[in-house]
Swiss-Prot record:
Belongs to the bacterial ribosomal protein bL34 family. Keywords: Ribonucleoprotein, Ribosomal protein. The keyword Ribonucleoprotein applies. This is Large ribosomal subunit protein bL34. Residues 10-45 have a biased composition (Basic residues). It comes from the Bacteria. InterPro entries: Ribosomal_bL34, Ribosomal_bL34_CS. GO terms for cellular component: ribonucleoprotein complex; ribosome. Residues 1-45 are annotated as: Disordered. Pfam families: Ribosomal_L34 (PF00468). GO terms for biological process: translation. The gene is rpmH. It comes from Prochlorococcus marinus (strain NATL2A). GO terms for molecular function: structural constituent of ribosome.
Length: 45
């Protein structure tokens, strides 16, 4: 069996789907708004 080598990179993840990136675009703001409305504890990554 081979090892699972994918670890995930936090910097990359933040750059793609962090809070500040979400606030940049209209659709990103909509995502945050929807998640607030649903009562999510984590709005973004």
């Amino acid at each position: 069996m081979t090892k699972r080598t994918f670890g995930g990179t936090s910097r990359k993840r933040k750059r793609v789907s962090g809070f500040r990136v979400r606030m940049r675009s209209h659709t990103g703001r909509r995502v945050v708004r929807t998640r607030r409305k649903r009562g999510r504890s984590r709005l973004t990554v």
